[in-house]
């Protein structure tokens, strides 16, 4: 009785904090998956990767197959607000698990709501294309391993494809994207670098000036390491044989072999004619064209989509800082054999 009075007094003074939070959203069950596939039967896959790692190129290539559709940036699990926000309120929880609701059989319907919403969005698009396998490409740079866990809670039966790129080129590409866009997040020091790049770009290729601030290197590289490590660990742990990873550089050097492997994982065969289609797709770079239209004098300084751009621009400080943060990860993924680069 005393504890009840204390609880009542606390709520009167501070409000009921529990009222603002719903309970954990349960993972979908195998029975639920089997049932929902009666209505949404297409097989699903998801492409994750750190931003500027080739996720868009991979999306463009994978949907060349006549049976595979892929669209992009749904961010169901990879960027706030997430898919779960549809049911992530106390009011939604109360409605979906209400005991008087004869449709829920005494269970929380939240995971079914999430699955049905995402299934409909993807399958509607795939139906228009006449394709039977459908996936979404969304970079997972901000949520890392949690994105994999959230995906598995709704799509334990899906395929997860993760693309990795040399973190040094990721750093270069992300930096130039922000400079080309003249991002609102640029700080005064960043703006001075941008102005210097406009006046005399050669000073950034002779090792005397860096296009990075120390803070930018630390933020991007630490994020890259965390993204690669957590996605690989959680992907293998949760998805097992339904998880696969590839390197962006391998996709560029042997595109048909890599795409054959991925299509096989999705359960479809690749006709030899697709090799020509892949070559045609690789001959264009929409991102490069867009950046040139946006800010040509900056965009033209760096060839887009190539591997090894970092070698032109890294200063000794950049190398040292990168090695300190991510040297081991570079070696783990076969980008370097030792740390004396």
What residue spans do the PLM features occupy?
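C-terminal accessory extensions appended to soluble enzyme cores
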Residues: 303-341
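PAPS-dependent sulfotransferase catalytic core
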Residues: 1-119, 128, 180-181, 187-194, ...
């Amino acid at each position: 009785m005393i504890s009840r009075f204390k609880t009542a007094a606390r709520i009167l003074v501070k409000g009921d904090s529990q009222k603002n939070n719903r309970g954990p959203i349960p993972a979908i069950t195998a029975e639920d998956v089997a049932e929902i596939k009666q209505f949404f039967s297409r097989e699903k896959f998801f492409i994750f990767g750190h931003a500027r790692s080739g996720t868009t190129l991979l999306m463009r290539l994978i949907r060349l197959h006549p049976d595979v559709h892929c669209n992009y940036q749904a961010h169901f699990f990879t960027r706030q607000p997430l898919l779960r926000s549809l049911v992530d309120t106390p009011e939604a929880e109360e409605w979906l698990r209400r005991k008087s609701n004869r449709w829920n059989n005494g269970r929380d319907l939240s995971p079914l709501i999430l699955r049905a919403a995402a299934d409909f969005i993807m399958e509607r698009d795939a139906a228009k294309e006449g394709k039977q396998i459908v996936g979404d490409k969304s970079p997972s740079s901000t949520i890392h391993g949690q994105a994999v866990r959230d995906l598995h809670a709704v799509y334990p039966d899906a395929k997860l494809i993760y693309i990795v790129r040399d973190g040094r080129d990721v750093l270069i590409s992300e930096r130039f994207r922000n400079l080309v866009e003249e991002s609102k997040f640029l700080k005064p020091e960043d703006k001075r670098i941008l102005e210097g790049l406009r006046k005399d770009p050669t000073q950034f290729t002779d090792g005397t000036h860096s296009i990075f601030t120390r803070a930018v290197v630390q933020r991007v590289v630490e994020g890259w390491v965390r993204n690669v490590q957590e996605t690989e660990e959680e992907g293998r742990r949760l998805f097992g044989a339904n998880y696969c990873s590839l390197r962006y550089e391998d996709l560029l050097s042997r595109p048909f072999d890599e795409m054959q492997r991925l299509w096989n994982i999705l359960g479809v065969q690749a006709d030899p004619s697709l090799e020509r289609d892949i070559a045609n797709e690789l001959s264009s770079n929409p991102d490069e064209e867009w950046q040139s239209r946006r800010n040509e004098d900056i965009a033209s300084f760096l060839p887009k989509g190539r591997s090894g751009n970092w070698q032109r621009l890294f200063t000794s400080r950049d190398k040292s800082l990168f090695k300190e943060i991510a040297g081991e990860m570079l070696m783990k993924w076969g980008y370097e054999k030792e740390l004396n680069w």
